[in-house]
UniProtKB/Swiss-Prot annotation:
The lineage of its organism: Eukaryota, Metazoa, Chordata, Craniata, Vertebrata. It holds the Pfam family L_HMGIC_fpl. The chain crosses the membrane at residues 22-42, 96-116, 126-146, 177-197. Signal peptide: none annotated. This is LHFPL tetraspan subfamily member 3 protein.
Amino acid sequence: MLSPQEAAKIYHANYIRNSGAIGVLWAIFTICFAIVNIVCFIQPYWIGDGVDTPQAGYFGLFHFCIGSGFSKELTCTGSFTEFSSIPSGAFKAASFFIGLSMTLIIGCIVSFGLFFFCNTATVYKICAWMQLCSAACLVLGCMIFPDGWDADEVKRMCGEKTDKYSLGACSVRWAYILAIIGILDALILSFLAFVLGNRLDSLMAEQLKLESKDDGNA
């Protein structure tokens, strides 16, 4: 029959092996979230035209395309590098926060390299804080973005009834919905990283106690 110390050592070894597998899944989903974040930042499909809109078109954070008259041709403009071309202060703020969220999650992925040099639990906690901050920036970006719907360019596409937080004849598109889903994803990833980091810390403390007991018995 195994002694309590031997049983504890087997438990620790099994847990570390299982947590390693969970950590790999966490890393994969973090990379997936980064891709989602980049797509939301770049794609101009946050809001778009509807059946009754005066003009065809679609808007992103900083890039937008609007039709002209009865022509099906869309005129596109706006660039993050040309901040003055963004039609609304709210769109500029939303672009900044979503861009910051993207930068943080890319920084989190770069931090994976620290697993080879630093304490694993500490790296998990660093990544958890970065993911939590990334989620907070996404929340701010998604909340601020509708404040710019009263911009003249948006009204030209969506109609005069369009106002802050009211889209008039337009509708929300997939990139906006994806960004909202990304918030939940980032929060779950952050929570999981905190759990993994704290659990590894407690396991290390227990292992040190067992080793000290073994040394004392010897």
